Amino acid sequence: MSIKPILTAEQLTALWQRRAATRAYDPAKKIPDSDFEAILQAGRLSPSSVGSEPWQFLVVQNRELRAQLKPVSWGMATQVDDASHLVVILAKKNARYDSPFFDDIIARRGFTGEAAEAARAKYARFQIHDADILASERSVFDWACKQTYIAMANMMTAAAALGIDSCPIEGFDYAEVNRILAGAGCFDAQEWGVSVMLTFGYRTANIKPKSRKPIEEVVRWIR
């Protein structure tokens, strides 16, 4: 079954050329609800390893919470006050094949009986042998965090397609951000942890052209 392209190759490249990490937003310009819903759907509908979806998206619009996050989040210090939306992406802790979390995955995918047991055996083989991620709680959490970056990238691409700017944020004190948000009742720190953050809005000025390696340096064809 063929799918009719929505964008040409040239339009897609132009979209990526325009997308850039935005450090300053127009505080007077807010993202329409319908557009931001589409961005959230891009995250929700993203692919993840073995269909795990080990994420939650916190949309932090509370100004008091943003003010608390600002001094411990140097990567968004120039953005957090003026960004239309701030999203904190959480990753699931202890997302093991033998956990209740994976029970939900199996049920959601409609597996029962022998099919459910076969699915769990497949997930076990992947986590124990193929990916080898069960050495520690941290290694399982890091695996879950990897999945959140897929969702983050899709959300930024969706935003760019809608003419909305964004910036991925890793520059923050993870322990403090977790403490602030969990302490405010935003999530259960036994079950979830902060993976990465994103700001969204509309840039206030032109951003200098991208500095990227030429494609010949980053792509090798093995024929």
Which residues make up each language-model segment?
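Acidic, surface-exposed loops and disordered segments
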Residues: 1-223
